[in-house]
Amino acid sequence: MRRRLIALSLLALLLLLAGGATTSSAKSKPKPKKAKKALTAKQKLAKVKHFVVIYEENHSFDNLYGGWEGVDGRTKAPAGRTTQVSQAGTPYTCLLQNDGNLTSPPLGASCTDTTTGASFSSAFTNAPFSIDQYIPATATTCPDPAHAFSFPNGVKNGSGLPGGCTRDLVHEFYQEQYQLNGGAQNRYVTGSDSIGMTMGYYDTKALPIYGYLHAKGHPRYAILDNFFQAAFGGSFLNHQWLIAAASPTYANPPDALRSIIDSNGMPVKYPLYNPTGTVRRGPIAVACPSPVPGRACGDFAVNTMQPTYQPFGSFGAKLVPQTNPTIGDRLIAKNVNWSWFAGGWSNAAGVVSGPGWTNGSGPNCSDANVISGSKYPNCPDNLFQFHHQPFNYYAAYAPGETKRAHLRDEAEFLDVASASSGKHCGLPPVSFVKPLGEENEHPGYASEPNGSNHLVTLVRTIERSACAKDTMVIVAYDEFGGQWDHVSPPGQGATAGPHDEWGPGSRIAALVISPSLGAPFVVDHTQHDTTSILATLEHRYNVAPLGTRDAAVRDLSSVFLAKAAH
């Protein structure tokens, strides 16, 4: 009995010790950490402290980024939105060319077209073609800046500067609507002064920006393949929509400034287009009622005009000062600092000794690249584009006004970003960056690869600074530059989405760079237009929308939901 009690006691002791060891072991184990809850897209947007909008020039998505992996690019274009048709609706056999480096001769003709009434020979069939194959980056086809607008059909290879420039292409309000053809995307050739050039595209993978974003250690980025220019037409109007989501007004303009369109909505004759009636290519919309249903009419500026205030150019009529609200006004009211940084601004605006100033102390402009006839201190570069400075059209930003201080030189942006080290980013919360003409990628007067190199410089400067940790960089092209794209914009044909009589127009190239993206490289297929940039700023800083379009579109926080490309 005694032995049995001793055995039971020992067993109890062993169980107690085992239990104690188990308890002690359990206590020594660290408690598992709670999984960190993923931030929503809205929360990620709220954590962005700096926005940098780099506004490049004149390229449709297919023309520039159509060869990027994972996107709705050129290889996915259906024949019905690729094959170009004549004014009568007949598919061309060949592409007629008038860029001096694409005509036959000098190129050998391998195609004959008899669809236009007068036959022509060409080296190009009716299909998209590689520009690089005929005008590589090394081609000496770029104009001297002093004569940049003297070569309507481009500079012959061997007689210009290196850079692989092409001729310019028309990109205007009424013409683009004809080119889109209700979403058929098949009248880019017929509705253009540059005809077959509209179907050219660049080797996406040869672009400097592509190389930078595929190099080891590249920043996280999104490519947006469903992003459209806000308004039909050109740079002037789309810069206005970038800052105001509205078309400029001009009450009771001189009649000579009004556009006149024919029954097809076209205002001009081109090599493959013959007007059906009286036409006039003007900066102001047609008089109401519009002769073509759905075409905008009234007292609105739709094509390039000059600002009233310096700096302004000598070509074209001046637009009366604008007074409607802009995103700049909205941000100022919320005490959010911002700046428009433009290449060449100090020289053009007469900011003597300011960042980027290169014209000495007077009494004459001394920079060799100044526009001939300029009077000191307004010494604009030959390729300074006055209509790319949208705030300068507004009375609130006139010389002498307090808000004028928000208009600065791109050189200052680079200086401030470069000097941002440690934990401090010296950039304002919102920066718009507009490169000078030589560096903005615009066909005709700028080299695409050189402009893309400058874009890399801008992005790299940000990414190497203290700003990189909380900055969203938005790279967008202002408009299509007259170049074909296969995706129908909202409001064209059966394509749904926010639209009105002003746009959106063709799909354009766009990128977003942010450390908060879900993967090193994502593709965002969400539908956007240029006013999505405004919506992003409006939502981030809780300011009222400027118009109906920016109130309706998706903002760019959608990039935080985008998936990695496969």
Segments the model singles out, each with a brief description of its role:
Residues 1-9:
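Bacterial N-terminal signal peptides that target proteins for export
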Residues 26-566:
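N-terminal pro-sequences and low-complexity stem/linker regions of secreted or lumenal proteins
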Residues 9-18:
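Bacterial N-terminal signal peptides
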